[in-house]
Each structure stands twice: as structure tokens, then as C-alpha cells.
Amino acid sequence: MGYNAGSYDVIVIGAGHAGCEAGLAAARMGSKTLMLTINLDMVAFMPCNPSVGGPAKGIVVREIDALGGEMGRNIDKTHIQMRMLNTGKGPAVRALRAQADKFSYQHELKKTIEETPNLTLFQGLVERLIIEDGVCKGVITQAGAEYTAKTVVITTGTFLRGEIIMGDLKYSSGPNNQQPSITLSEHLEELGFDLVRFKTGTPPRVNSNTIDYSKTEIQPGDDKPRAFSFETTKFIMDQIPCWLTYTSTETHRLIDENLHRSAMYSGMIKGTGPRYCPSIEDKVVRFNDKPRHQIFLEPEGRNTQEVYVQGLSTSLPEDVQRAMLRTIPGLENVEMMRTGYAIEYDAIVPTQLWPTLETKKIKNLYTAGQINGTSGYEEAAGQGLMAGINAACRSLGKKEVILGRADAYIGVLIDDLVTKGTNEPYRLLTSRAEYRLLLRHDNADLRLTEVGREIGLIKEDRYERFTNKKLQIEQEKERLESIFIKPRPEVQELIRSIGGSELKDGIRASDLLRRPEVTYEHIHLLVPSEVALSDEITEQVEIQTKYEGYIEKSLQQVERMKKMENKKIPVDIDYDAISSLASEARQKLKDVRPLSMGQASRISGVNPADVSILLIYIEQGKIARVSNQ
């Protein structure tokens, strides 16, 4: 027998990385919000790698922070190591990565949630949604509690019909042996949602006291203080190193001999795994010409001896895992503390979503995170933030927010999901962004702080600091444009010392900075600023000056794309009435229901001829419409 348990503006199902961002965003925007989770002790849990960031993903964390989300602030408070990656490459691919103290990360984020006004956190298992006339009105828990809401966000991660698999052992479970969510998955199928079966995995954890670190290579963090959040002013200087080792020929022999016992190769696993995070079995089979593979030993926290064996994700049986670990240099006498495993779970086909992450079938119902077919904490958090923002906007009667492909990696991620779909766990890569020179780690605040302020997630004091930063950047760029540097002896000496060509005539400071060997520090030595400028400001001045021509080209491409994005397609257009469309294009357009010509052009199976036919049809103005959209 059910009972009325309360009414809310927004209900978030799940409290992983997507759920935490969704709940916090909705509450901070003024929506009365309820977060329901299977286990309160697992809020913001990291079931796989104890890290945040990396290529593309680190930029997402910066974007989350620029919009007013929490992940960046939280990892800045709880990391054990920070490293800037790809420092020898251009600014488009530089990204920050942090090793997390996974237990502190959980504790701090749960504390933030508990202290946030408008936000209630409750332990309960959601089994059904309350649906009336195609509109989501709330949720029903296993205990019979009926919570009503204006909007609902599902962020169930890998819990939907989750199954853990190790060798021939298979049992129903969420990650880390938590209770799975079975009934909700069945309910989503009853509602007509298409679900797919995906798989991911995790490596074993070992006892640090039993590792011989003398046989490994130390991987320290950066000496220079780093942060994900633009608000962070206190930096953790006491860093803990990671360690690098490798598999051996004995490791590979052992895996080859036991492939028939791997759930991946025995046929026990049916779900599709992540292409960019293969198991060790996959690596040995697919890259059998490689004599060894990298293994990173990553501490799971400051107050634990557990070490994450990055690069050894596996579904081999426990006895094989024990033996395999001891074939790796430095791990000859290691004690395994947790086994690695594969986990299969249900995900929704993401082309069933609008770009707001609202489902097309059920109004006021949003989904975010691994349920949408992605992998990774950062991808989940970015989706959770946008779903939470849009659920709150809907509940408050405000216009929803859609980030474009030229606005943010989050925009690329969501557009890829809802436009192209995915047939494997989706991982964000820099190569997926066509405007990656514009979507850099360093300029996330310049791109998105205005958006965060408009929706109410950026406070006035932070916005004031942001506008002051923008002003200082422009003033310094103008100063360098106005100053001429003459070929004085000290100038020529500096240029020679860095391998540059001597000046023949005077040169603008900005033009000298455009030389590849010249940095802002060199310019500062020659013509110092009278105003003390932060590293963030001088970095922007240097990047914007050096890459001005390339940035301008990218902006021109964006303007051309915007013309297509601004050509809107009615949601209820009847594609069957456009007889000239190719049959595959017609079906894909009906499935995705793009909102613009730009989105239509990115659907696989819709070729340029189909786009032209659709554009002409819409411009003629006589648009046939379907009644059920």
C-alpha cells in the first residue's frame, strides 16, 4: 500500500557523479529538490579509477566549474596529486588530471549536499515512475513512498539490472557489490524505452605494503600548484606519487592460457564494452605484437593501503587474477585486496532524448550519466549538471539551456549522444570536438561563466572577479599592441639565448610574442607591465595573441555552422510527407527528430542531398505535421 511522502519541484534518482551535480544545480537554482539513492554511504562513490580529469575530460570538469557545478571544487579539496598533461603540445589538448582520495571525495561532496538549502537526501530504491498522460509526475519507491514532482532526473549509473561477472561467476549486483535496480529497468521498458546492454570493468586493488616500489618508476605530481576550479585559492602541496610498471611475457602467457576462463571470451558477457578502456585480456589478444603494457599503481587515498592497478581491468577468475598480479615487476609478492570484475548494465538509447536531456516519450523526465550510454565520472557529471539545470528551469517556468558544439565539450558530448547515438560506452575525446582550439582548458570560464550567471549558479562576487579578469586580459593585449621594441643589445641577446632570429627593425611586442620561441615571460623581461598580473591572465594574453589567426579561422567556421543551427525544424514535421528523402534518411530523421538543420546534417545516414531536400521543403512553408509530437 503506497503513501504520500511529499511533493518537490525536482526529484533526482541516484547520487553518483551525475546525480550529485543534478541535485546541487536544481537546489541552488531555487527548486525544492529530493535526491533518492540506494545507499547513503555511497554518495559520490568512485567505483572504478580514483581520478578526475585527463584529455577532454579535464576540460569538462573546468566547464562544470565555470557553469557553477561542484566537481572541480570538490576534487581541488580532496586530491592527492595533480598533473597537467600534454604540456609539450598546443593549448587545445592540454588537460589537468588529479588522483583523488576517493574516500575524502565522497565525504566532502556528501557534506556539501547535506548543507545545501532546498536539497533533501534520502535512502530509498525507486521502482516506478508516476506517469499521467505522457507526463512524469513523480516516483514510487520499494517501500511504497509516493513522491510527486514537477520534473524527475534519472541518474542510475550501472545499477539498472546490473550483473557482476568474474570468470564463470555471475550474480545480480550494482558496482562494488551494491544492490542493483531491477524493477525500474523493467518499468522503463514497459513505458516503451529502447534499452541496450553495455559492459564496463575494473581492475584488482592491492595492498601497498606488499609492493616493491624499487622495481617501478615514480610518477610525481606537478610542483606548480594546479586547480580545476576557478575559485580555488588554497592548494594542496603534500602530494602522493603514483608508480609505473609493466606487464611481462609471463603475464601474457598466463592470460593466453586462461582466455577460455575469461567472461569476455567465454561468451558469458553479452554487453558491449568501452573501446577506449579495454580489459587486459583484450589488450593481450588485440595487440599481441606488444611485449608489454603499461600498468600504473594509483593510491586510493591518504588513509588506506589500497592501490588501484590501472591498466589491468579484467573479468578473469579470482585465482588467475592473483597469479597474474605476481607476474608484474614490483608485484611479485603482492597481496590482492579486491578482485577486478566486469559489470553489465542497461542503458537507454540516447537518441530518445532531446538536447535538453529530456526524454521524447515522457515529458518532464530527464536522464543523465551512464544510463545515457557514456563512460566516465566527468561525462556523467557534465550531463548531470545540464539535466539538473534543465529540470529546474522547467519546474521554475524558465527557458531551458542547450550548449552547442562550439560552446563546450559538454555540448559536443550531448549532441553526439542525442544526434548520433552510441553502440558502445561513449568516451569523450579531444578528436570528437571540431572546434577544440576554442574549447580549451584555460578559457572555460570565458566561455561559460556568463551562462552560469544567467541561470543563477554563479554568485555576484565571483562574477565581479571574472569581469575584472576579462578587463585585465584586454588591457594587457592592447598594451602589447601599442608598444614597440627596438633592436637594443639586451633585446638581441635575449632573442639569441632562446634560439630566435635577431631583430632587424623595431617590432610590436605582440608580434614578437607571436614568434614560437617567445613566451610572455620573455616579453615581460623586456617591457614589464606596471600592474601585477596573475598567471591565468598572462596565459590568456599569450594564447590569444599567439593563436589569433587560428582562433579567428575557427570562429569563422562557427559562424557558418550557426547559420545552419539557426534554421529550425518543427518538432512535429511529418517526414513521410517529403517523398524525395532517401528511405534511410527519413527513418533516421523520424527517430532523432532534429531541432535544426545543423543537427540534421550530423545524423549518420542523412547525406547532404537529404539535407538540401529538407531545407527546400521547410523554406517553401507548406509543412505537413504529425499529430502525436
Curated annotation (Swiss-Prot):
Keywords attached to this entry: Cytoplasm, FAD, Flavoprotein, NAD, tRNA processing
Pfam families: GIDA, GIDA_C_1st, SAM_GIDA_C
Chain residues that bind FAD: G14, A15, G16, H17, A18, G19, V126, S181, Q370
Cofactor entry: FAD
Superkingdom, natural source: Bacteria
One GO BP: tRNA methylation
Cellular compartments annotated: Cytoplasm
Record: residues binding NAD(+): 273-287
Keyword match tRNA processing: yes
Statement: the UniProt record of this protein carries the keyword Zinc: no
InterPro entries listed in its UniProt record: FAD/NAD-bd_sf, GIDA_C_N, MnmG, MnmG-rel, MnmG-rel_CS, MnmG_C, MnmG_C_subdom, MnmG_C_subdom_sf
HAMAP family recorded: MnmG_GidA (MF_00129)
UniProt name for this protein: tRNA uridine 5-carboxymethylaminomethyl modification enzyme MnmG
